[in-house]
Amino acid sequence: MNTYEEYSEEELNDYIQLSIQDSCQDAFLKSAASLAAVTDENLRVLAAIEQGEVSVLREMLRHTFAFREVDSRGWLPLHRAASQPVLEVLETVLRSQELSLEERTAVGGETPLTLAVKAEMAPNVKTLLERGASPHNTNSKNESPLLLAVRVGSCEMTSTLVAHGAWVEQVCRKRWTAMHEAAKVGNVDILMLLLRNGGRVNQKDVTGVTPLAVAAEHGHFHITEILLNCGSRVNSQALNGESVLLDAAGSGNTACIQLLLDNGADPNLPSITGHLAIHKAAYAGHYDALKMLIPLTTRKAIKEAGQSPVHSAADGGQTRCLQLLLAHGFDVNYRMNTRNSENYRDMRRSALYFAVSNGDVDCTRILLSAGAKTDLDPLSCLLVAVRSGRYEIVKLLLAAKADVNCYFTVVSDTVFPTALQYCLKDEVMMRLLLNNGYRVDRCFHCHHDSGFDAIDDVEGKIPFCEFMSLCCLMHLSGSAVQILLDYVSHVNICSKLRRILERQREWPDICEILNSPRSLKHLCRLEVRRCLTLKRLSNPEIMNSHVFPPGLKSFIMYKELDLYSQAHECIV
């Protein structure tokens, strides 16, 4: 393999200059104004089309070959003429001999007619059709000229195409019809034109969606009304089971929703995943739509769905909808059923978990204020927040009595509570946990030294010393242990942990702490906290009572080591 070292400096300069020239040339050739042409005559034809010079084009008609040459996109001069605004230019190009009106471009498979429609050149469309262009030939996406005309919202082009035999029910690759497109665009005139010419209101695309569902999804009231009056099925469901009303709930258009309900739409019709219209409205944050659907949705339907709209509102981060649902008596602790829970790798069950995993402080606060429990999921909400570095959410969860000493043993079954694993690099988070009663003593329980008291529940579990011996964590052991020592009295360091710590820069400080008696102030705080118990320490009513003066409370609660609160106060 050649390397740059094999070339002289002069050769390298020549090579670089040539590369730059090639790059510039490629960029030039790819630009719309400089598409490759075979002959000078073709270049003149293309320039005349771009500049609208009809007289030059007439002169070039004798060079018929110039009109048959394609550029680098596979475009003939006819394709360019069809998509430019001067009708006389197109008419002049059409006078050239041996031109097929159905020639396709190399990219996109566009015909002159589809290009004219996309460019919204109604006179060009009419001229091409009058010259014999087929209204049925599609581009490479199987999109017909009629479908494209509806998409750009041109009633004139749509009418012209229909008058020249365009088939209203022609489908694209996804079996999407002009009726679907009209429902999406929301053009009443076009829809009425299609209906008068054979448009079917219950035609389904490849996903089972009808024009009515499309209109409802995009909140087009008048289109929805027309389709219903023409016999569209109000409770039609797509292949995924989503109903027309569910689509309307996603748009949030209350007029559409009410219209569907007045015409017999069932608010308790579930999708394949079990979702109802109320779930969609809650997730999307459509407050007024949700307000309409709450009294119409049965508790039985929600139970069968296996998921509460509270889950949906929390997942979507919709605080107003969340408050509305809770105010109407929806259970804040409703657990998703197993079927829905299995759709998530973490097997989540509670609405609180959605809020916490999304890092949504406001929704978390609302749910906790309404009495949300913190221990309803296989993986604790607190562990999720700690792992994500969400300090404010961790504080909220701890204030709501989340268990700081919980365990999650699926990944690693440790002697010490799991939360510490997720914040070894984050002193702020570590101290947030330690200040709120994390059992630091469990980090110094192991079986390595014979002189150490045997502990039954250590057997078969991973002690802290072994966990920190992992090569990816060893460099964190010094700082972690130094922090932990602020929350214990005298502890024994096992030989395994000692060997790890001796290689860390924090070892001299750790050694001094271990070999010196702890201060009376430090020991008093530990004893007071032990006597109070974690339950009382976590109770705001007790800790905010007159029994504890502010200074004493701050001392007991390790306020001088609460790095998060200190940083927050500095910002404020």
Pin down the residues of each PLM region.
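Ankyrin-repeat start motif
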Residues: 43, 76, 111, 144, ...
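Ankyrin repeat start-site detector
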Residues: 40, 72-73, 107-108, 140-141, ...
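Ankyrin-repeat C-terminal turn/loop position
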Residues: 65, 98-99, 133, 166, ...
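Ankyrin-repeat junction/capping positions
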Residues: 68, 102-103, 136, 169, ...
